[in-house]
Amino acid sequence: MFCYQCEQTAGGSGCTRVGVCGKNEDIASLQDTIIIGLKGIAAYAYHAGELGARDPEVDAFMHEALFTTLTNVDFDLNRHIETALKVGAMNLRVMELLDRAHVERFGAPEPTKVSTGTKAGPGILVTGHDLLDLYELLRQTEGTGINVYTHGEMLPAHAYPELKKFPHLVGNYGSAWQNQKKEFEDFPGAILGTTNCVLIPKESYRERMFTCGIAGLPGVTHIKNRDFTPVIEKAKSLPPLEEKAGGELTTGFHHQAVLKLAGQIIDAVKAGKIRHFFLVGGCDGAKPGRNYYTEFVEKVPKDCVVLTLGCGKYRFNHLDLGDIDGIPRLLDMGQCNNAYSALQVALALADAFKCSVNELPLSLVLSWFEQKAVAILLTLLHLGVRNIRIGPSLPAFLTPGVLKVLQEKYNLKPITTPEQDLKEILG
């Protein structure tokens, strides 16, 4: 543990074995888990709020949960576990809120093929998560001859009707956040970072990068009030992109789109044509070992379907997995917050087969990197989902004691190898 939030912290530098206040490492671990999960909720609530959607119950809970982590407030382990699970419950509410706000503003996502090539002409590359920022940029660039490209978690934007209607939203450039320094350096146009997942830029592209909203970078112009004039003018002044052919990625399998296939899916399961579903997704990152997810999906048998979301999908969304009776074997459900869609599909299947989610032929193999992923994990635990595999490593803020509780109650486990995990899951 490490805690230095009060004046009496050990040695004036930090408590590392037990708190001077009396809290042990497990309480400290759960307090960290609560705070980290609340950060994830805050991100989703911020996006929903920008679209005019708010939930007073979520706001009130955030105050209550933060209060529990103050010095000398609560030393009860079980109460801390309850609060951590309630973080998951509130994250479910806020993901639903954000999904509803996105659909009301931009329409329900629909399966869409997205080009990874480039068009001749000036371009702007948009990274992050904020669909409203992208919409405003598209509106302001209409008729300018500037093409707009998505990057990273912005890929699913192409599936929303009110965004895809802009003909100058032409494709997706690059991959996940950790590759941006190379990809942004190679992209000759202007670059806009809208939320988290920006990195301190290299000098080679700093002067043509911009941030807006919550994002900020040193030496980079910050756009206020969604007036993207400086970005547009910069794009016009830069060398145009060349026409380059690329492949295609498919996104847009929002739960509304997937549930339209529910009859086909149920029939395929009953006929033995679909043996198992895998949710393989979450965050991507630079840590070695994430090739596990590529190899895992490559080795998934042909009678299984893979659902994915978040930027972790870039490890395998280029693979052509084909289909089963017209049902794509790889279904990209969207951004990390579209974990809500995955849950809706799981609940609908459980209802159709008259069983619990844990009794479905469904396995979760998650990749995590940051705080939103922790909030989603807590949501899954709140719902009682068991047998989740997580990687590439377990969270450092979970002590052996807390991890033991999660393993005993939920059978939460680290990934091992694709071969071993598939064998254990499928038998």
From Swiss-Prot:
How is its cofactor bound, per UniProt? Binds 1 [4Fe-4S] cluster. Binds 1 hybrid [4Fe-2O-2S] cluster.
| CDD domains given in the database record | HCP
Q: Which cofactor does it need?
A: [4Fe-4S] cluster; hybrid [4Fe-2O-2S] cluster
**Catalytic activity annotation:** A + NH4(+) + H2O = hydroxylamine + AH2 + H(+)
Q: Tell me where in this chain the PTM Cysteine persulfide is found.
A: 283
Sequence positions that bind [4Fe-4S] cluster: 3, 6, 15, 21
Spell out the disulfide connections: none
Location of the protein in the cell: Cytoplasm
GO CC terms in record = cytoplasm
Q: Note the InterPro entries from the entry.
A: HCP/CODH, Hydroxylam_reduct, Prismane-like_a/b-sand, Prismane-like_sf, Prismane_a-bundle
Q: Which GO terms describe its molecular function?
A: 4 iron, 4 sulfur cluster binding; hydroxylamine reductase activity; metal ion binding; peroxidase activity
- Reading the lineage from the top rank, the first entry is Bacteria
Instruction: Name its GO BP terms in alphabetical order.
Output: response to hydrogen peroxide
Positions annotated to bind hybrid [4Fe-2O-2S] cluster: 129, 153, 197, 283, 311, 336, 370, 372
Q: What SUPFAM superfamilies has UniProt attached to this entry?
A: Prismane protein-like
What are the record keywords, sorted?
4Fe-4S, Cytoplasm, Iron, Iron-sulfur, Metal-binding, Oxidoreductase
Query: Per the UniProt record, which EC number(s) apply here?
Result: 1.7.99.1
Family in the record: Belongs to the HCP family.
Function text: Catalyzes the reduction of hydroxylamine to form NH(3) and H(2)O.
- NCBIfam families annotated for this entry? hybrid_clust, PRK05290.1
Name used for this protein in its record: Hydroxylamine reductase
Native source organism of the sequence: Moorella thermoacetica (strain ATCC 39073 / JCM 9320)
Q: Organism classification, top ranks?
A: Bacteria, Bacillati, Bacillota, Clostridia, Moorellales
